[in-house]
Each structure stands twice: as C-alpha cells, then as structure tokens.
Amino acid sequence: MPDVKKNVIVNHSVDEMFNLVDRIEDYPLFLPWCGGSKVLERNDDITKASIHIKYSGVNQSFTTQNTKDYPSRIDLKLIDGPFKVLEGYWIFTKIHEEACSIEFHLHYEFSNFILDKLISPIFSQIANTFVDGFVTQADKIYKK
C-alpha cells in the first residue's frame, strides 16, 4: 500500500495552516486536480466532506471524515470512495508566532486491481504535490 509522507516548514502560523486545510470547500480554487468539493458536516470536532478528482482523465469522488484537534492535528479517514483504505493526518507544530512545521502522512489502497492500475499513478502524483499546493495558497492569501 502506498504511503505519502511530507514535512515542510512554512512562514505561517499553525492557525493559518490548520484553517486553510480545514476549508475543504476552497480546494477547487487552488488545487488544479480538484473538480469540486462539498462539506457535508462541520463542527469543532469533525469535518465530513466529499472531494471530486478531475485530472488527466480521472473522474472519481471520495468522502472523508476529518477529526480535528485545533490547531495542531487533523486525522483523515475514508467514509466512501474508490479506496479500500484511505487514512492519514496533518500535524501542525508551532515554531514561533509566524512559523510552523507541517507533517502530512497519507496511506491508501484502491478497492480493486483495475482502479489501482488506472488511478494509482495519477493519485500518487496528486498526493505527492498536495502539501505544495497548500503552501503556495498560504503564501498567496496570507501575503508573507
């Protein structure tokens, strides 16, 4: 099963980065592979949302429940979609008021062999550039 791990240090606060990741409804604005997103439920503890991947001929949607520990952690767990397994987390660690480290980990397995062969190379590319998209968007909206 593929694992994606990424660690970066950014010149943005943990609050800014946590909020950017939690605003799933904004993903289509800055993630080129995201063909749409819909928040199904949101409260202080969880965000349930569906994301539509529309990229390089792939047209798939999945739904996750994201358990939140503001502002330090978001855990992702699959509810529905073309995966047998999709789970991961974001960890935001304060370095000082205007900087933090971000640790992203994603573990996934597609539900069948055909999907794995068709979608896995594209999903791997998406997952490996995921954090970069958030850093670029944070630099843009927080103007640092």
Regions found by a protein language model. Give the residues of each.
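Hydrophobic/aromatic beta-strand elements that line small-molecule binding cavities or substrate pockets
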Residues: 6-8, 37-38, 62-67, 87-94
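Beta-strand elements of well-folded, non-transmembrane domains
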Residues: 10-14, 53-57, 68-70, 82, ...
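Short, highly charged C-terminal tails/helix-capping segments
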Residues: 136-144
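A short, structured loop/turn motif at beta-sheet edges
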Residues: 14, 41-45, 67-72, 91-101
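Beta-strand/loop substructures that line and gate deep hydrophobic ligand-binding cavities in soluble
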Residues: 78-129
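Glycine-rich portal/gate segments that line the openings of hydrophobic small-molecule binding cavities
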Residues: 38-79, 133, 137
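One face of beta-strands
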Residues: 2, 51, 60-64, 72, ...
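Hydrophobic ligand-binding cavity/cleft-lining segments
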Residues: 1-45, 144
